[in-house]
């Protein structure tokens, strides 16, 4: 079987609102194929807020 890896860093802050849902989809066009997600990870670094009280 052929295995593919997709890895991309995207600054989502520039494209989406503060609250979003993340997902994915796949297609082969008109043909049938089975897709297996063997690994999935999502990492977010949120800037902290400070209070001036």
UniProtKB/Swiss-Prot annotation:
It comes from the Eukaryota. Keywords: Lectin. Pfam families: Lectin_legB (PF00139). One of its GO terms (molecular function) is carbohydrate binding. Coiled coil: none annotated. InterPro entries: ConA-like_dom_sf, Lectin_LegA_CS, Legume_lectin_dom. Belongs to the leguminous lectin family. Tetramer of two alpha and two beta chains. This is Lectin alpha chain. It comes from Lathyrus clymenum (Spanish vetchling).
């Amino acid at each position: 079987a052929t295995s593919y890896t997709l890895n991309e860093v995207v600054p989502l802050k520039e494209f989406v609102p503060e609250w979003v849902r993340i997902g994915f989809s796949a297609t082969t066009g008109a043909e049938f194929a089975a897709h297996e997600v063997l690994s999935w990870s999502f990492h977010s670094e949120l800037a902290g807020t400070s209070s001036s009280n």
